[in-house]
A protein has these predicted regions:
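Basic, Lys/Arg-enriched alpha-helical interface segments
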Residues: 1-66, 74-78, 88-91
Length: 91
């Protein structure tokens, strides 16, 4: 089982999202994804998990909700890098 490491940017993003439109469901939406990541299970197809390229090469992205993305990297730990909408994360 992997451990979770949260970047400072992720912590800031999580705080923002927990006060925004996803506040009622954020924890419930994140829990199954994080459980799958730490236990090395593949994510359900609905999360649209895929590799990133460019500045984010080596990272993966999944859709927690249609307009809420999680950028992460798996190695010995699961590093949560960013959380937010596509426009917030990619400009």
């Amino acid at each position: 089982m992997r451990t979770i490491e949260r970047s400072s940017a992720f912590k800031r993003d999580y705080k923002r999202e927990s006060k925004g439109k996803h506040r009622a469901t954020l924890d419930d939406d994140l829990k199954p994804v994080l459980t799958a990541l730490v236990t090395d299970q593949s994510l359900d197809h609905r999360y649209r998990d895929h590799n990133l390229s460019g500045d984010w090469v080596g990272y993966r992205e999944c859709h927690i909700r249609p307009d809420l993305l999680l950028i992460y990297r798996k190695s010995d730990t699961v590093r949560l890098a960013r959380l937010g909408s596509h426009s917030e994360l990619f400009g």
